[in-house]
């Protein structure tokens, strides 16, 4: 008993003696609430008043709040930013609408300054013009690593947006491949890398490419980023040189991001070197499932490669029970001889909703459409929940692309039955657009049947059914539905009214109410402290994220409510884009279409989206909810546009191995 009391007392003492937590608590409970009243209104003038706050942290947060707040008086904003001269203040200009006169004003400010003003440099990178690029290139390479990176990124960003001369390209390439600062080397090349596949953008010229090849021979960056970019830039016309450059590397254990970059380069190249299939074969043995999956996708696009590598495809992936189902199905989609092993294929991924697209893609390779249709209908009849939802999507896709021969009267009737069953369950209609749009599936006689689905239904208890049925009525029977919808709207609660307004019926004149943001629990945030650690337990290992409460309090307060309620537990990573992000946290649909019952504002910052950063997904400014993502690689095009709420501080190797459908088994505070 005494021991328990002693430990509890010690914990209280530690908390009381933690000055960082104490100060964060003061800010969160005493200063932030007033600032966030202004943020919730996106009131630029009210937010401005906090930029002169006596507390530096509040001041910085106010400037960052202006990144996503439209400001009408840009002249005043530039003047105030110049006076403050903080990186957060300069960041407030990133997304504002600037005129050519404003950009020239920024150029003049830079002439009076230098590269040490990293905030101003960042704005020129985002908003600058041809003259801005010239001025930045006239700057000598700064001795400070961070300053060099910021200058390099501004130059790299601008090369993606403005025309460059041959001399400028040569200078940028030389800077990139002679720097000992890996982050800066990569940043210099950013614009060329981003534009490499864009036919409407300027490409790196022959002279600059030749210079790059010459310098690359003796370039040994400490980090993999520069090599990734160089490989991507050279793969199209110099793939043999790229393979030779990495000839001493073990492709089986190659850095995940570099391996994926090379595989994607092979996929985009019409004239690959003879070593390409050798490299792809080696990548089939890679430790990362994402590398293997990418290699399989590339092989499937090259018919001759698939024939040549089929033994490895079958033995290492499709028929290998030691690898995950995602890899096996990707293998079956790639093998030209998958039909021989249909019994094996039919046993894989039957209950995993996230594998149905791969599963049915493979079945379409070995069966005709009618057999796939019959099998799919049987699957739908015996499924529910998320699996049911994904199978509806597969049926919709099959029907949208099917030949007329498949669409017999009998199958039209079958699809009609599936459609009405789905509507009665409240399934989302965008999953079934091809089904209800087909007049042979849903005809004029079905109008009354649709109305019958709403009989004896409660608006409160069956809101999903009302949402689904009214959506189909809007798309197919808008004129006939006017009386029904008008009466329904008059008697509806707020949720159904908002649904009907969002459907944009021609006779409903009301508009959606402004979004009301969730109010943070400031006292709870103070208890969490400035940097709590959130743990996601997956079958591939734990991912630990150190959160930044003072930068994204509204975001983290909402997430905290979901974490404590167990809402993230059992929710999968529904989106995986290799060499970009993994994304999860859709606590509503599990597929990326939904979120929680609240909205929080975008909480942008002056920080970069480096590898490992944790961000919040959105469909635009101030639409954030529960979905989160972790960066595989540096993605500066997201800077200022998406909330950064923390960083993965343990488990990045797990992040690299996550594939679509991997589930968070448990989610908790450390």
Regions flagged by a language model, labelled:
Residues 9, 184, 258, 291, ...:
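Catalytic-loop motifs flanking and including active-site residues across diverse enzymes
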Residues 23-41, 49, 57-71, 86-100, ...:
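Structural detector for internal amphipathic alpha-helices that build alpha-solenoid repeat scaffolds
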Residues 20-22, 40-52, 70-81, 99-111, ...:
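Amphipathic alpha-helical scaffolding segments comprising HEAT/armadillo-like alpha-solenoid repeats
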Residues 17-20, 372, 378, 382-386, ...:
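Cyclophilin-like peptidyl-prolyl cis-trans isomerases
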Residues 53, 286, 538:
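Acidic surface patches and DE-rich sequence motifs
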Residues 4-13:
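Sec-dependent N-terminal signal peptides
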Residues 13-27:
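Bacterial Sec-dependent signal peptides at the C-terminal "C-region" and cleavage site
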């Amino acid at each position: 008993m005494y021991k328990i009391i002693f430990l509890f007392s010690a914990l209280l003492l530690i908390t009381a003696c933690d000055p960082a937590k104490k100060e964060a608590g003061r800010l969160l409970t005493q200063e932030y609430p007033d600032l966030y009243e202004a943020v919730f209104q996106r009131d630029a003038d009210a937010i401005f008043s906090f930029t002169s706050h006596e507390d530096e942290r509040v001041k910085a947060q106010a400037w960052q709040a202006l990144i996503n707040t439209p400001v009408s008086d840009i002249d005043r904003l530039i003047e105030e930013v110049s006076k403050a001269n903080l990186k957060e203040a300069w960041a407030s200009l990133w997304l504002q609408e600037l005129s050519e006169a404003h950009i020239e004003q920024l150029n003049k400010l830079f002439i009076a300054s230098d590269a040490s003003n990293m905030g101003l440099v960042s704005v020129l990178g985002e908003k600058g013009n041809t003259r801005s690029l010239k001025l930045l290139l006239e700057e000598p390479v700064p001795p400070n690593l961070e300053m060099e990176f910021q200058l390099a990124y501004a130059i790299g960003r601008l090369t993606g947006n403005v025309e460059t001369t041959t001399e400028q390209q040569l200078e940028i390439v030389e800077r990139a491949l002679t720097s000992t600062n890996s982050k800066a080397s990569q940043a210099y090349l950013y614009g060329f890398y981003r534009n490499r596949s864009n036919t409407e953008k300027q490409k790196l010229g022959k002279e600059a490419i030749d210079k790059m090849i010459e310098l690359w021979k003796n370039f040994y960056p400490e980090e993999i980023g520069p090599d990734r970019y160089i490989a991507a830039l050279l793969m199209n016309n110099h793939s043999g040189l790229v393979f030779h450059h990495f000839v001493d590397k073990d492709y089986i254990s190659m850095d995940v991001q570099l391996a994926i970059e090379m595989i994607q380069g092979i996929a985009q190249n019409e004239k690959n070197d003879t070593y390409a299939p050798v490299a792809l074969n080696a990548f089939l043995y890679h430790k990362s499932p994402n590398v293997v999956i990418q290699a399989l996708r590339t092989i499937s696009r090259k018919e001759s490669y698939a024939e040549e590598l089929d033994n490895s495809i079958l033995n290492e992936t499709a028929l290998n029970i030691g690898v995950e189902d995602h890899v096996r199905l990707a293998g079956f989609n790639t093998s030209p001889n998958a039909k021989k092993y249909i019994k094996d294929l039919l046993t894989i991924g039957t209950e995993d909703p996230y594998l149905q697209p791969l599963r049915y893609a493979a079945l379409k390779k070995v069966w005709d459409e009618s057999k796939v249709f019959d099998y799919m209908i049987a699957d739908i009849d015996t499924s529910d929940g998320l699996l049911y939802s994904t199978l509806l999507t597969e049926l919709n896709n099959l029907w949208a692309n099917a030949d007329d021969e498949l669409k017999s009267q009998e199958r039209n009737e079958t699809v009609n039955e599936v459609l009405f069953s789905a509507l009665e369950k409240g399934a989302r209609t965008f999953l079934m657009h091809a089904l209800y749009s087909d007049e042979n599936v849903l005809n004029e006689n079905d109008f009354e049947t649709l109305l019958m689905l709403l009989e004896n239904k409660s608006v409160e208890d069956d809101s999903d059914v009302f949402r689904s049925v009214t959506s189909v009525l809007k798309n197919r029977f808008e004129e006939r539905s006017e009386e029904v919808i008008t009466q329904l709207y008059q008697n509806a609660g707020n949720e159904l009214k908002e649904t009907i307004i969002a459907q944009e019926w021609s006779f409903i004149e009301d508009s959606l109410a402004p979004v009301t943001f969730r109010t943070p629990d400031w006292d709870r945030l103070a208890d969490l402290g400035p940097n709590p650690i959130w743990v996601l337990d997956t079958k591939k290992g734990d991912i630990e994220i150190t959160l930044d409460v003072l930068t994204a309090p509204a975001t983290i307060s909402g997430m905290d409510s979901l974490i404590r309620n167990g809402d993230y537990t059992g929710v999968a990573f529904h989106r995986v884009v290799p060499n970009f992000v993994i994304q999860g946290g859709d606590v509503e649909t599990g597929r990326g279409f939904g979120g929680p019952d609240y909205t929080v504002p975008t909480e942008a910052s002056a920080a970069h989206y480096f590898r490992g950063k944790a961000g919040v997904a959105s469909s635009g400014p101030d639409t954030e909810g529960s979905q989160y993502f972790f960066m595989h690689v540096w993605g500066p095009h997201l800077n200022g546009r998406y909330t950064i709420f923390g960083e993965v501080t343990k488990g990045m190797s797990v992040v690299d191995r996550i594939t679509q459908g991997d589930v968070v088994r448990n989610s908790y505070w450390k």
